C-alpha cells in the first residue's frame, strides 16, 4: 500500500489527466467545426493518450491496494478559437501537467516509495515527448501565419498521426 499522502496525490493527478482528456475533446470539437480533419485527428489521438494516462494511474492505485477518490472534472475553458491560439493553450496545459507530474514525483520521493518513483518515471519521460510534439505543431503554426494554403498542408500532415496504446510503468 502507498502512503496516504501519496494516495491523495495520485487521486488529484488522476483527475487532472481526465480533465486533459475533456479539454482536448472540447478543442477537437472546435477543429471539427472548422472542418480541419487533420487537427481533429491530432486531437483525437491526444484524447486517447490522455485516457490511457488516466487509466494507467487508475490501475496503479488499484494495484497498490489503495483507494480511488473521484472528484468533479471542471468545464474546459478554451482561450481562443484559431489553431495557433489553441495550440498555444495546449502547450501551456502540457507544461502545467509536467509541473503536476513533477510534484507527484516529489511526494513519492518524500515518502520514499521506490515503486511509485519507478512507475512515475514513465510519466516524466512522456511529458517531455508531449511538450515536444505540441511544440513542433506550434512552431509550424507560427511560421504559417495567415497562409491558408500552408494551414491546409499542415492539416493534411496531421491526419497521419495514429494512436499507439502506451505500455505504462
Walk through the language-model features, giving the residues of each.
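Iron-associated oxidoreductase/ferritin-like identity signal
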Residues: 1-169
